[in-house]
Each structure stands twice: as structure tokens, then as C-alpha cells.
């Protein structure tokens, strides 16, 4: 399979919107490409992701929040699909990090609450760590979609009961960073509040990491260190 990088010019740049804050690059990952696209569109406030032929490639679109925060939203393909080759995944990871020129400020792991969380999600999380290194967990936020039937408080009571131990372990490491994200709502206030919750977590991650994003150099160092570790083991 060939790879391509889609980097459209944002509508905000076209309009000449003044941006008063440093750009934040957020990457959407998960098992369901449809879920990733819908979530990305809701963060953008526009239907941008999901165009024909784009599902298997990284794409980036931009938006600016009312308070002047520019956000680059990067959609990844279904990188945790067992039918996708390791070589293809590696190339798309590089494409993703190329799009995030200043580095990745947060990784949003999109999880559907429609069905029981299974070993396939565990495999996806393990794949994420194997590709990016355990350092990526410091930038991880869980977006829990398809939970429209829940109110926030009700969900907080329900979630520990349905959450498997592997996910609880990762959540503890991530300081419990999760957002119940309603992709079906037409309420603009709810939409704005969801994005605000996500960006509050992004700000907390940046503060904890001394404003240092995850960069392509970090990724390449992880690959080099892994290689030499394997050589030493042999």
C-alpha cells in the first residue's frame, strides 16, 4: 500500500483569524475509523474528515476556539487493524509526526461504549505503546464515545463496573484522563463543553511535561534504543 499525507489549509487560516496562543496538535487514534472521523469533525465543528479514499491515510484539519486557541486535529487510519502491515503502520506514524510540526501535545484514544471493552482494545493500547514507547502514555486522553444514554454522574458510577483491569491500570497512569464525548448531540453548548474538557486535559498534559510535546526525535530515539536493546539481548 502507498501512503500519503493530507494537510489541508484550515478555514481559520483562510479567514485570517488572529491566533493569540501557541498551536496545539492533537492526534486521534482507535480501532474504529468511523468513530475517529466523527469525533474529529465534532472537535473541529465542521464535517472535514471521512472523504473518499482518506480512511487509510493521516489527515489534518485546523480550527480555532473562541478564546484564540488554534487546534490541529490529526486523524490516523485504523492503525490497530490486524490486516494492516507493520511497514504501513510505521510509515503512517512518521506521516502523523510530520504533520505535527511542533510535536504532538495529546493523543486522544477513541473508545466506543456501545459494546463491552475487550482484548482487542487491550491489543490496540499495547500496539500504541510498542510503536510510540511508554512515553506516549504521558500524553494520552481517553475519549469515550457512544455513551449518549449516560448522564455524566451516572456514567462515573457505571464506568468502573464495565472497565477491565488493563484499562484501569492505564487510566491510573494517565491520572484518570477521560471525557464522555457525545457525538450525537445537536446542543452547541454541550459540544463546546466537551471540547473545553478535552483542551483542559491537553493544557494539564503540557504543564506536566514542561510544555514539551511528543516529537519525531523522541520516536526515532525509541526506535534506535529498541534496536540496540535487541542487539544486546542477542
From Swiss-Prot:
<dbReference type="InterPro" id="IPR045058">
    <property type="entry name" value="GIMA/IAN/Toc"/>
</dbReference>
<dbReference type="InterPro" id="IPR006703">
    <property type="entry name" value="G_AIG1"/>
</dbReference>
<feature type="binding site">
    <location>
        <position position="183"/>
    </location>
    <ligand>
        <name>GTP</name>
    </ligand>
</feature>
<keyword id="KW-0342">GTP-binding</keyword>
<protein>
    <recommendedName>
        <fullName>Immune-associated nucleotide-binding protein 2</fullName>
    </recommendedName>
</protein>
<dbReference type="GO" id="GO:0005886">
    <property type="term" value="C:plasma membrane"/>
</dbReference>
<feature type="binding site">
    <location>
        <position position="51"/>
    </location>
    <ligand>
        <name>GTP</name>
    </ligand>
</feature>
<comment type="similarity">
    <text>Belongs to the TRAFAC class TrmE-Era-EngA-EngB-Septin-like GTPase superfamily. AIG1/Toc34/Toc159-like paraseptin GTPase family. IAN subfamily.</text>
</comment>
<dbReference type="GO" id="GO:0005783">
    <property type="term" value="C:endoplasmic reticulum"/>
</dbReference>
<feature type="domain" description="AIG1-type G">
    <location>
        <begin position="21"/>
        <end position="223"/>
    </location>
</feature>
<dbReference type="GO" id="GO:0005525">
    <property type="term" value="F:GTP binding"/>
</dbReference>
<keyword id="KW-0547">Nucleotide-binding</keyword>
<dbReference type="GO" id="GO:0034605">
    <property type="term" value="P:cellular response to heat"/>
</dbReference>
<dbReference type="InterPro" id="IPR027417">
    <property type="entry name" value="P-loop_NTPase"/>
</dbReference>
<dbReference type="GO" id="GO:0030968">
    <property type="term" value="P:endoplasmic reticulum unfolded protein response"/>
</dbReference>
<feature type="binding site">
    <location>
        <begin position="30"/>
        <end position="38"/>
    </location>
    <ligand>
        <name>GTP</name>
    </ligand>
</feature>
<dbReference type="Pfam" id="PF04548">
    <property type="entry name" value="AIG1"/>
</dbReference>
Amino acid at each position: 500500500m502507498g501512503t500519503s499525507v493530507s494537510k489541508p489549509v484550515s478555514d481559520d487560516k483562510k479567514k485570517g483569524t488572529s491566533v493569540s496562543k501557541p498551536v496545539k496538535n492533537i492526534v486521534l487514534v482507535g480501532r474504529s475509523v468511523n468513530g475517529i472521523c466523527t469525533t474529529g469533525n465534532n472537535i473541529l465543528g465542521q464535517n472535514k474528515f471521512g472523504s473518499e479514499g482518506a480512511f487509510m491515510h493521516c489527515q489534518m484539519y485546523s480550527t480555532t476556539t473562541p478564546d484564540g486557541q488554534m487546534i490541529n486535529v490529526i486523524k490516523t487510519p485504523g492503525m490497530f487493524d490486524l490486516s494492516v502491515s507493520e511497514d504501513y503502520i510505521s510509515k503512517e506514524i512518521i506521516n502523523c509526526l510530520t504533520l505535527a510540526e511542533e510535536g504532538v501535545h495529546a493523543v486522544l484514544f477513541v473508545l466506543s461504549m456501545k459494546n463491552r471493552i475487550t482484548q482487542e482494545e487491550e491489543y490496540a493500547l499495547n500496539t500504541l505503546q510498542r510503536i510510540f514507547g511508554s512515553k506516549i502514555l504521558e500524553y494520552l486522553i481517553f475519549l469515550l464515545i457512544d455513551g449518549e444514554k449516560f448522564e455524566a454522574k451516572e456514567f462515573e458510577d457505571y464506568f468502573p463496573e464495565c472497565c477491565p483491569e488493563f484499562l484501569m491500570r492505564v487510566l491510573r497512569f494517565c491520572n484518570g484522563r477521560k471525557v464522555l464525548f457525545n457525538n450525537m448531540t445537536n446542543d452547541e453548548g454541550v459540544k463546546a463543553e466537551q471540547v473545553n474538557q478535552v483542551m483542559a486535559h491537553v493544557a494539564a498534559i503540557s504543564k506536566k511535561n514542561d510544555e514539551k510535546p511528543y516529537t519525531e526525535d523522541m520516536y526515532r530515539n525509541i526506535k534506535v534504543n529498541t534496536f540496540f536493546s535487541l542487539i544486546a539481548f542477542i
